[in-house]
Amino acid sequence: MTSSGPGPRFLLLLPLLLPPAASASDRPRGRDPVNPEKLLVITVATAETEGYLRFLRSAEFFNYTVRTLGLGEEWRGGDVARTVGGGQKVRWLKKEMEKYADREDMIIMFVDSYDVILAGSPTELLKKFVQSGSRLLFSAESFCWPEWGLAEQYPEVGTGKRFLNSGGFIGFATTIHQIVRQWKYKDDDDDQLFYTRLYLDPGLREKLSLNLDHKSRIFQNLNGALDEVVLKFDRNRVRIRNVAYDTLPVVVHGNGPTKLQLNYLGNYVPKGWTPEGGCGFCNQDRRTLPGGQPPPRVFLAVFVEQPTPFLPRFLQRLLLLDYPPDRVTLFLHNNEVFHEPHIADSWPQLQDHFSAVKLVGPEEALSPGEARDMAMDLCRQDPECEFYFSLDADTVLTNLQTLRILIEENRKVIAPMLSRHGKLWSNFWGALSPDEYYARSEDYVELVQRKRVGVWNVPYISQAYVIRGDTLRTELPQRDVFSGSDTDPDMAFCKSFRDKGIFLHLSNQHEFGRLLATSRYDTEHLHPDLWQIFDNPVDWKEQYIHENYSRALEGEGIVEQPCPDVYWFPLLSEQMCDELVAEMEHYGQWSGGRHEDSRLAGGYENVPTVDIHMKQVGYEDQWLQLLRTYVGPMTESLFPGYHTKARAVMNFVVRYRPDEQPSLRPHHDSSTFTLNVALNHKGLDYEGGGCRFLRYDCVISSPRKGWALLHPGRLTHYHEGLPTTWGTRYIMVSFVDP
């Protein structure tokens, strides 16, 4: 047998065998062994798996003629992934070769298909076969399988692989017929042992000119040789190079435990992706959803398995997906009591939007694996479920056409590539370690950064993916896909698909969105999203920075100057203002507005206010990051020639009330410049208030919520806080560059 993958697995090997020893001038016309028209590739496959279709795609690329044996038949050749077997392949080949028993001008290459890729042309294959001087050339490997005791009977080899591998051989039809007609064993007997014993017969080996491809000129078996193989990129083609023997193999065989490495190579060879042409096969199987017809029915499964920042925004994005909601059934599993209010707020909209909905809450006490099994099985058991779309709450799909795009890719399983903003952390692994955990593939960074764009066969995907419903029903009918082992649910899921020979595809052809970081999300805060400026800066900005801030920074005429050198610009969103005030009131320990202040190094405040420092609520670092990221650039734009490090020791929220502290006496600030942000609405939350700059006799009487006043501090801008006459006024103040 060949040391191949789970049976029925078949290997694709494309060697070429020599005609009888004779000079070119002695050969009759029509019997040129380098004539591709006289070459036939025979392979074996009982089902049109993705591996088989990949093999055919590579054969079609080079215009090979392929004959497949066994399609639609039952595999009775044993579990060749775990033990000996594969004899059924020899029986099928024996019968097929009867057709060519007298074809002396014909060359046959036999290869498996599920784990084989062709990397060279028929002409190259035939030339290399002729150069081998053989009538039948087998592929070679480093292991004597399945009987190590036969190793000593093999001829010594100076350089190269010593032992026969039956996953690929090439030879004259008459010679192959002479070999396989000797098969008289059972279907689950070992094919490789059969060929090995014939090869080890010295008389037969010499009589039939049997040889091994010791240096991988034609056949590259990957098992035991991964360190020898590298990708060789040409402008519009990719192949592998064996650096140990400096050869360019024509047939690449992922025998034994090297299926994932073959998948990696198959992303490139022969034209999966090239530096000049990009993705060569991406559009080959695409199927555009026809207009005017209802699109496929989708089961959308959403999982909230841990405390997750910005969940209300995630739920609102579900309503914006560019896909007819009447064709979507929503399943939502929430494992967190903390998020129940968020889901309750959005659930009426979700119920009205989608064709059907189901909510499973924390009271069900389902593990993440059990919840995922439940959702997937609901699709599996529904004949009308055409696609299963799994989406975790820590994904941010900014491309609203994601679902439509993935369906049109027409793959059994496909995920959109998502990564954390500015990080290499993503929702896929490019390779696995020997114990099936994360390993970084050579192209991982290029894929995450989209320097190489295409559709990729990877060993692990998570957090967002689409699966065909019929794939679940026919190829993965068991329910316990996620919870059937002790491993992480996503790892168990991926292994289940890999073990079935189902490819896990990843598309990075489009910008789909990003992932959220969740590990440091602290739900002890009243509004924990406020603290996400470091971990999830893009989402934080979208939620908490004023929608017109960027336009103001770009000089689009939004910034105002109500007083000399006093600039007014939009900075914080309404939500940021509200949550900042709520955090302060929730903390509740307002200073008394006295001169004595134990929070200060000297214990004395010259111009006291009723306030709470950012440091008191644990928000100092986050606020300083806001100053660096948003206030610093604006300051340098408004005051040309000044460079700020946006340092501030005093950052605090001030509360003005008529019965508490209604105003603030004239003073200079201990800063190079001061930031003063209104946190609520005049006329709605309070009356009065405002700021007067005494030297210029200039008053700003109606501060706008979320807008910041930016002005010089010490020396020039002597100012006072005007009395608040009704309600409560809140402002955020920073003394920057003291």
UniProtKB/Swiss-Prot annotation:
GO terms for cellular component: endoplasmic reticulum; endoplasmic reticulum lumen; endoplasmic reticulum membrane; extracellular space; rough endoplasmic reticulum; trans-Golgi network. The keyword Cell cycle does not apply. Coiled coil: none annotated. Mn(2+) binds at residues 112, 115, 253. It catalyses: L-lysyl-[collagen] + 2-oxoglutarate + O2 = (5R)-5-hydroxy-L-lysyl-[collagen] + succinate + CO2; (5R)-5-hydroxy-L-lysyl-[collagen] + UDP-alpha-D-galactose = (5R)-5-O-(beta-D-galactosyl)-5-hydroxy-L-lysyl-[collagen] + UDP + H(+); (5R)-5-O-(beta-D-galactosyl)-5-hydroxy-L-lysyl-[collagen] + UDP-alpha-D-glucose = (5R)-5-O-[alpha-D-glucosyl-(1->2)-beta-D-galactosyl]-5-hydroxy-L-lysyl-[collagen] + UDP + H(+). It holds the Pfam family GT_PLOD. Residues 25-290 are annotated as: Required for glycosyltransferase activity. PROSITE patterns: FE2OG_OXY (PS51471), LYS_HYDROXYLASE (PS01325). 2-oxoglutarate binds at residues 599, 656, 676, 729. Residues 295-520 are annotated as: Accessory region. Its EC number is 1.14.11.4, 2.4.1.50, 2.4.1.66. Homodimer. Multifunctional enzyme that catalyzes a series of post-translational modifications on Lys residues in procollagen. Plays a redundant role in catalyzing the formation of hydroxylysine residues in -Xaa-Lys-Gly- sequences in collagens. Plays a redundant role in catalyzing the transfer of galactose onto hydroxylysine groups, giving rise to galactosyl 5-hydroxylysine. Has an essential role by catalyzing the subsequent transfer of glucose moieties, giving rise to 1,2-glucosylgalactosyl-5-hydroxylysine residues. This is Multifunctional procollagen lysine hydroxylase and glycosyltransferase LH3. It comes from Pongo abelii. The gene is PLOD3.
